[in-house]
């Protein structure tokens, strides 16, 4: 996942619809369908979550789905945070660990910021530091899960729903990253 930051907000119907449009746009325009299919089919249950979410790219979403993103409060905050961080300005601090980590990646080596964020900062999207980031990611993951019948893939074999699979795999991802 590229830079992913977000705002916690109660979901109004307008926000929910707007976030659905953002999710559809992100899946369609910012993820390579063949790559996603390959990840879903070939990754083990333990690897599928990280292999997918580390491909989620907030920079792409901002560029290719900017209108949809700005209408979804969770995503709009992410755009504001990305802009502030890129300009070296203070953020509102709603996702302190994630924002600090992204800022450190930007200051260490701007040419490697996306890989730095993916390997070092993504965990903060799922560890409770940034609930809105987790919500955006859950929407994208769940859409992919449904499109590719992920729960019935032989290596995944999950009896529940895609959002519940996301929550279970997110917890496992955090536990593994914190080892």
Curated annotation (Swiss-Prot):
This is Protein dct-5. It is a single-pass membrane protein. It comes from the Eukaryota. Its main location: membrane. It is found in: Membrane. The lineage of its organism: Eukaryota, Metazoa, Ecdysozoa, Nematoda, Chromadorea. InterPro entries: DUF5332 (IPR035161). PANTHER family: PROTEIN DCT-5, PROTEIN DCT-5-RELATED. GO terms for cellular component: membrane. The chain crosses the membrane at residues 11-27. Acts downstream of daf-16/foxo to suppress tumors induced by disruption of gld-1. Potentially a direct target of daf-15/foxo. Keywords: Membrane, Transmembrane, Transmembrane helix.
